[in-house]
Amino acid sequence: ILKGPTAMGMVKLMDDSDNGDTGANHYNFTIAASPDEITPQIVQGNVDIAAVPANLASVLYNKEGVDVSVLAVNTLGVLYIVENGDSVQSVADLKGKTIYASGKGATPEYALNYMLTANGIDPEKDVTIEYKSEHSECVAALAANEDAVAMLPQPFVTVAMTQNENIRVALDLTEEWEKASGDGDTKAALITGVVIARNDFIEAHPDAVETFLQQYEASVNYVNDNVAEAAVLVGNYDIVAAQVAEKAIPECNITFIAGNDMKAKLSSYLGILFEQNPAAVGGALPNDDFYYNAD
């Protein structure tokens, strides 16, 4: 699982697992700092279930020799444009600026490019996007430069604001994405993270997968309903400090969406990415068999 909202939604299940309270299912959790650490583990078959960026799930599905299904959406939009100052009131104000970001080749890059392009800003020419390998480096860049602008996900927005009172949220990428993607039924949700599993594991252990999904949904509900208690667990697992987690959890869009609802939301999101850059989803949109327990 990825360090961030994904891992935060999983903490109650991790705690139950450590206390031997997960019934017949036994778990071995690993928290990774970036998706690059997770991909080879799935490809090599070392991991049965993984929480990954939404587009990476599609890339893996399209990869030869990798057979995966998506079990659930676990994180909606968590990206924000933050700045050290007060110069960004709209997307148009980003023109000519340097934006620090991480997540090149994943949801953050595509969401940023989509938002800029929809507002008439060319990501290649009209702004300078400096990609860092980890979110913490963007937080450091914000602290070091008085007029810096960064794109950060929660909980790192809260981390940055805790470290520097001059940092403010300028734009919510989820709102900007929805504005850009149309009205009413055509509006596509910005999806950050999903849970996938190897198909050979699903076929060999169908009951264990169903139990996992029930326990994971319960964990997500616990985290959203018991923020203070969940924040302590987030701190215990060294994801972010408990006091940061307590402020961040309500902003993290931690969710559990499965079945047909997952398929509807995720397929429309991947469709937008595909239009923008087919490589973002692995060159082709996944077939129906990608979506676990969906018609």
PLM feature spans:
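Short, glycine-/small- and polar/acidic-enriched structural segments
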Residues: I1-E124, T128-Y131, A148, Q154, ...
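Secondary-structure end/capping motifs
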Residues: I202-Q276
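Short, surface-exposed acidic
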Residues: P123-V127, D238-P250, A280-N287
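Short, solvent-exposed loop/beta-turn-alpha elements that line the ligand-binding surface or hinge
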Residues: S17-N25, E175-A188, I254-K263
